[in-house]
Amino acid sequence: MAYLFTSESVSEGHPDKIADQISDAILDAHLAEDRNSRVAAETLVTSGLVVLSGEITSQARVEPREIAREVIRDIGYTDPRIRFDAESCGVISSLHEQSGDISQGVDGGEEQGAGDQGLMFGYACRETEELMPMPITFSHRLVQELAHIRKETDKMPYLRPDSKSQVTIEYKEDRMTPRRVHTVVVSTQHDEGVPQKKIREDVRDILLPRALPTDLLDEDLILHVNPTGRFVTGGPHGDTGVTGRKIIVDTYGGKGAHGGGAFSGKDPSKVDRSATYAARHVAKNLVAAELCDEAEVQLAYAIGVAEPVSIDVSTNGTGVLPDTELCEMVREHFELSPSAIIDRLDLLKPRYQKTAAYGHFGRPTFPWEELTHVEALKRDAPAVAS
């Protein structure tokens, strides 16, 4: 019997993703001037209004209100008719300084403690060349390509910034080998008066061939386009958006576990972010080293303590070695204190706004996607096995 698995994504113009991008743009602006900035920036967007809040300790001097407007403008919210645009929206800022009780246990060199307690997961598998699950990878491609069509071409000129996608993949009986794309759902905001038939035809004839491999598309594909029949009211005028509400979209689309912590607006002293990136780095290198076909890595931390309180590796029975031995290899090859993670993955570089739409993982420009440990893991595997 076939096995189906579904994941969703949302575009850069989705309200929650607007909030994520603003929060990360504020983080980037502080890191660009002060690498030691401590930032926890939260954003709310609603009809005609942006609210900024959170805690920041930094020597940087930035203008968060202008940063918010620039992000909104770059996404494409420039038309006042849709009731949310960069020039006319209100922006309220209530950012304030971080608690000294937290900073005394977090700041400081090699013994830098974790910014909070918590558990973080990383995942990798062989379904795509990015070593990511196929449903979330294809979902990201759909909304990313929609944004490209909207911003860079004259095709589908009726598109507005807000959109969502959902992809169901049919797998073979092993539940790991993709067979075909079973169902695609695309909901995209559009101008008034555009026939839904036209939008459906354009999604089928323009979007799908650009975004998805045609060898996985067949005549049995189930395609839903704007299933409600209309999507004119969207963006923050249609739904309020808040930082950190798309944590499954940000990660693996429901494959693997999630520790619950969001990423955007947080500097890398917050292990919610940095340790999740490190866990992905570990998992991807294990799979790329052909030590397993699937890897889920859990890291856990205590606030103010540098070393993780636990490390776990699960391969779902696909490992060439027992999971306990792979876990020992991880301990041997990867330093997982906050300071070591920050140094190895170059996490003080202001690149975070780029992560805030279309997924934090499976994108080769990010250092946590680099295969830096593959050869060392391969060399060490026979020694562990013996």
Swiss-Prot record:
GO terms for cellular component: cytoplasm. Its cofactor is Mg(2+); K(+). Binds 2 divalent ions per subunit. It catalyses: L-methionine + ATP + H2O = S-adenosyl-L-methionine + phosphate + diphosphate. The keyword Transferase applies. Its EC number is 2.5.1.6. GO terms for molecular function: ATP binding; magnesium ion binding; methionine adenosyltransferase activity. Mg(2+) binds at residue 16. L-methionine binds at residues 55, 98, 239, 270. Pathway: Amino-acid biosynthesis; S-adenosyl-L-methionine biosynthesis; S-adenosyl-L-methionine from L-methionine: step 1/1. The keyword Acetylation does not apply. Keywords: ATP-binding, Cytoplasm, Magnesium, Metal-binding, Nucleotide-binding, One-carbon metabolism, Potassium, Transferase. K(+) binds at residue 42. Pfam families: S-AdoMet_synt_C, S-AdoMet_synt_M, S-AdoMet_synt_N. Residues 98-108 are annotated as: Flexible loop. It is found in: Cytoplasm. GO terms for biological process: one-carbon metabolic process; S-adenosylmethionine biosynthetic process. It is an enzyme of class 2 (transferase). ATP binds at residues 14, 162-164, 230-231, 239, 245-246, 262, 266. Coiled coil: none annotated. Homotetramer; dimer of dimers. Catalyzes the formation of S-adenosylmethionine (AdoMet) from methionine and ATP. The overall synthetic reaction is composed of two sequential steps, AdoMet formation and the subsequent tripolyphosphate hydrolysis which occurs prior to release of AdoMet from the enzyme. Belongs to the AdoMet synthase family. This is S-adenosylmethionine synthase.
